[in-house]
């Protein structure tokens, strides 16, 4: 409990209690904190004290506030090698976490000109458009839109399901293994659709990654657009000294 007789300000004492609870797992990543009023009652302090402690913890990266929803424990940022070839499922397994993805939709559509150019196919050729949300624990990490050429992967839409690795489908069903890719990285701002799927505010900064994957003979096999909240991932680049 808080010590009113201590020379340490009450808000700092409260900060320490909350950070200790986070480290001990009392509040797990993405967990919602009690409301300001509930914390006031629990620790017998003013709302100003609670608010100061919460704001400091937000600035220090322990918590995140979502307008109209409350205050949540922030998941540690994932570190992702920008030029990595492995897919989401392989990456999550390499960190000791279980992959979790949710399929929003998958449809057969005619390829637009930009998609056709990336996949080196004719415009209007049939492609499967897959939209998914990829998670880190229970927090949305990535909103993904991927296109697969149907002529190269006939029937691929029948294998798509929640929890299924698309790289595994390519390897097991079509004997195709991506060996390298190109990526374009930009920063954009969340619109209504991204805000909904990534559980963030409209206007939040997002990483936008435009990726095309290739086989060893440079044949494009899919192209993806990934949107990721900048607070949830850090990208690294390992390169030889030149």
From Swiss-Prot:
UniProt-listed InterPro entries: Bact_HTH_transcr_reg, Chorismate_lyase_/UTRA_dom_sf, Tscrpt_reg_HTH_GntR, UTRA, WH-like_DNA-bd_sf, WH_DNA-bd_sf
SMART domains in UniProt: HTH_GNTR, UTRA
Keyword Repeat among record annotations: no
Keywords linked to the UniProt accession: DNA-binding, Transcription, Transcription regulation
DNA-binding residue intervals: 36-55
An example molecular function term from Gene Ontology annotations: DNA-binding transcription factor activity
PROSITE patterns for this protein: HTH_GNTR
Domain HTH gntR-type: 8-76
GO biological process, one term: negative regulation of DNA-templated transcription
Membrane-spanning residues: none
NCBIfam families, A to Z: PRK11402.1 (NF008491)
PANTHER family: MANNOSYL-D-GLYCERATE TRANSPORT/METABOLISM SYSTEM REPRESSOR MNGR-RELATED, MANNOSYL-D-GLYCERATE TRANSPORT_METABOLISM SYSTEM REPRESSOR MNGR-RELATED
Name this protein carries in UniProt: Uncharacterized HTH-type transcriptional regulator YurK
């Amino acid at each position: 409990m808080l010590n009113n007789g201590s020379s340490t300000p009450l808000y700092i004492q409260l900060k320490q209690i909350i950070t200790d609870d986070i480290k001990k797992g009392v509040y797990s990543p993405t967990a919602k904190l009690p409301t300001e009023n509930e914390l006031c009652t629990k620790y017998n302090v003013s709302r100003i004290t609670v608010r100061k402690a919460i704001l400091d913890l937000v600035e220090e990266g322990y918590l995140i506030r979502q307008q109209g929803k409350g205050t949540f424990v922030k998941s540690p940022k994932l570190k992702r090698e920008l030029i990595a070839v492995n897919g989401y499922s392989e990456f999550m397994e390499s960190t000791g976490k279980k992959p979790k993805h949710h399929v929003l939709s998958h449809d057969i559509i005619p390829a637009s000109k930009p998609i056709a150019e990336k996949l080196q196919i004719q415009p209007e050729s049939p492609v499967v458009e897959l939209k998914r949300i990829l998670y880190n624990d229970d927090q949305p990490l990535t909103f993904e839109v991927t296109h697969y050429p149907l002529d190269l992967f006939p029937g691929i839409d029948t294998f798509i399901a929640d929890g299924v690795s698309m790289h595994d489908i390519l390897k097991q069903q079509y004997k195709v293994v991506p060996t390298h890719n190109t990526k374009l990285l930009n920063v954009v701002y969340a619109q209504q659709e991204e805000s909904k799927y990534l559980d963030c505010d409209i206007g939040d900064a997002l990483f936008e990654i435009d990726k095309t994957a290739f086989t060893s003979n440079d044949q494009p096999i899919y192209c993806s657009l990934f949107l990721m909240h900048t607070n949830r991932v850090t990208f690294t680049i390992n390169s030889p000294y030149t």
